[in-house]
Amino acid sequence: MFVIKRNGYKENVMFDKITSRIRKLCYGLNTDHIDPIKIAMKVIQGIYNGVTTVELDTLTAEIAATCTTQHPDYAILAARIAVSNLHKETKKLFSEVMKDLFNYVNPKNGKHSPIISSITMDVVNKYKDKLNSVIIYERDFSYNYFGFKTLEKSYLLKINNKIVERPQHMLMRVAVGIHQWDIDSAIETYNLLSEKWFTHASPTLFNAGTSRHQMSSCFLLNMMDDSIEGIYDTLKRCALISKMAGGIGLSISNIRASGSYISGTNGASNGIIPMLRVYNNTARYIDQGGNKRPGVMTIYLEPWHSDIMAFLDLKKNTGNEEHRTRDLFIALWIPDLFMKRVKDDGEWSLMCPDECPGLDNVWGDEFERLYTLYEREKRYKSIIKARVVWKAIIESQIETGTPFILYKDACNKKSNQQNLGTIKCSNLCTEIIQYADANEVAVCNLASIALNMFVIDGQFDFLKLKDVVKVIVRNLNKIIDINYYPIPEAEISNKRHRPIGIGVQGLADAFILLNYPFDSLEAQDLNKKIFETIYYGALEASCELAEKEGPYDTYVGSYASNGILQYDLWNVVPSDLWNWEPLKDKIRTYGLRNSLLVAPMPTASTAQILGNNESVEPYTSNIYTRRVLSGEFQVVNPHLLRVLTERKLWNDEIKNRIMVDGGSIQNTNLPEDIKRVYKTIWEIPQKTIIKMAADRGAFIDQSQSMNIHIADPSYSKLTSMHFYGWSLGLKTGMYYLRTKPASAPIQFTLDKDKIKPLVVCDSEICTSCSG
């Protein structure tokens, strides 16, 4: 049997050569548990005559990855094999790769079509020796298999569908793309990115340094006008943003309801549903453009709008397709008055914004005055019990996981952009709270901090966290100035108000590394101190930028300009971790360069790249399934697998019991200290999750994407959760509702004979990668 090498030559397949290649990549791994010979034997069984070395490496990596239930180091080995394969297929020098990307010629028309920008190329040409010398390619080998495969699939740049970038090339491209001629800052950013202290958001990783450097994640729009012109002009804005893979939040509360009079045609309006079908089809059309991450929209509506009941049905699984929008997400922008009426079992008046104008433009007491005025004047379309609307909201959430819930009054009352006007919606993922109007489209650039990295020698390093936050602020602030904006209204807004969004990933990993149960008092205290540090560091960096460059244009009149910070708006006194009064004095003197700073977002893709748990979430399971070309296999929480392996508690019976129990270890005979630390989200009281969100909320000047997890949701459970979050002053009451299926799928992958009453075995576990 022969293999075809990269140079086209044939060579006999040699078992020893395969084993040797695997063994070379096992440096630093736990050799008590990693068995290169077993992997090589499985590879030999899976190859065919004429297999290429690239295919051989791919198969070897996948086989190693399937062994991750034996030991987490197998995931690192799998990644090393895949990375080694990529290194053999790509050029080493960063400058050479950038030159190839810049010199790209479209094969269909023969035209020069540079993939990276001319300024990026100019910077690389001037500093190529320095940039080439500081790149450390060994850091590519630190990714786990799934992180690396995520990079391969969507992030590393390609020429004619062939990957030409290595992960380190991508990170240096991002750093140079942001900092351009400031080469020292570029190298500082590169090192922090490649050491995994933080990551920029996906659009920045995709596009920094390229010819279309659209690096922003979030765009917030209001419907420009309740007219054909306004609706379709807004649709065009959405299409142009979606084309550049931006996520959209759109407020439609000013669009007249169904049955309302249209003076121009002497007819009646069809309401928001047919209009949203048009938006839905636009989202589907843009989706066909081959974007790495197609743009999607969340539609925001206030619950007084008389089309509210039809709106709540938009994503349901049954009903007339003409009344469904499967490709849009829906969210409610809820005033406090509605929550009070639900609580008091009061009546709720449904209104048309054409006949009851201005409700979307006011909040708090002013909203209540205007709304009750319209009620007294009997301008409403209909009156129903507030709890009828509430029940429809809960039913929709139980069936579809949506609508998302945000509290209009908290969002406006606690915003440092309150001086700009009424904020009418959030973004796609409910963590961005920014002002927009007909002439301005709000934008936000994001990055997330890998909190697990700051657990050093059993302690959390707050000083290092503050230092990294300050680098992120400077980076995101630069992106505002150099970004490619899909529409001019976005550029106007972003350069006037200069908001940024700093989030986190790996909070659960940090707790585990410190041996803190997620719901422990120690974890709750650390949660507060982490976000206090992030907010402090972000303010300090933004103030230092303002000292050099001046405050943002609309700073005067903001809360911060009057010495009021986010925690003041929550009536919270910070800990003594940082000295806040001198910082407040400095802000009074120099101002801030950025209107908003902190916004914990979902981090699904980037957390997978870095091998961390998502955002501020606990682990949802301790075991889950991954699919690769060669089939499906199980992956175990690497922290749990490592501790069980070290304590000689890991075996097939444990693995099978965890799988039978849907990723839980609570029904095992494992030690109690392990059970406490490795509770899943389903085993942690949701009120604790909500309380921790409120605790950190005092240091989050935008908002946070907070999911609610209830295995078997009911009207009473969900109502209790929502009212608890509202009473604590949360801005985002709920992103998704996550539930468990009514019945678990049959566990075909398990050997039923092996599922016995669990007894922890203290004997040596098998160290080979057995099938």
From Swiss-Prot:
A Pfam family assignment: ATP-cone
Entry's Gene Ontology molecular function annotations: ATP binding; ribonucleoside-diphosphate reductase activity, thioredoxin disulfide as acceptor
Entry's Gene Ontology BP terms: deoxyribonucleotide biosynthetic process
Keyword set, alphabetical order: Allosteric enzyme, ATP-binding, Deoxyribonucleotide synthesis, Early protein, Magnesium, Nucleotide-binding, Oxidoreductase
Binding of dTTP, residues: D226, S227, I228, K243, R256
Binding site for ATP: K5, R6, E11, N12, V13, M14, F15, D16, K17, T53, D57, K88
Note on cofactor: Maximal ribonucleotide reductase activity requires the presence of Mg(2+) ions.
The protein's Enzyme Commission number: 1.17.4.1
Keyword Phosphoprotein included in the entry's annotation: no
Residues that bind GDP: S202, S217, N427, E431, T603, A604, S605, T606
Keyword Nucleotide-binding belongs to the record: yes
Cofactor(s), names only, from the UniProt record: Mg(2+)
Active-site residues annotated for this sequence: N427 (proton acceptor), C429 (cysteine radical intermediate), E431 (proton acceptor)
Domain ATP-cone stretches: 1-92
Induction of synthesis: Expressed early in the viral replicative cycle.
Catalytic activity: a 2'-deoxyribonucleoside 5'-diphosphate + [thioredoxin]-disulfide + H2O = a ribonucleoside 5'-diphosphate + [thioredoxin]-dithiol
Protein task: Ribonucleoside-diphosphate reductase holoenzyme provides the precursors necessary for viral DNA synthesis. Allows virus growth in non-dividing cells. Catalyzes the biosynthesis of deoxyribonucleotides from the corresponding ribonucleotides.
Subunit structure: Interacts with RNR2/OPG047 subunit.
Family: Belongs to the ribonucleoside diphosphate reductase large chain family.
Protein name, entry field: Ribonucleoside-diphosphate reductase large subunit
Organism expressing this protein natively: Variola virus
UniProt lineage: Viruses, Varidnaviria, Bamfordvirae, Nucleocytoviricota, Pokkesviricetes
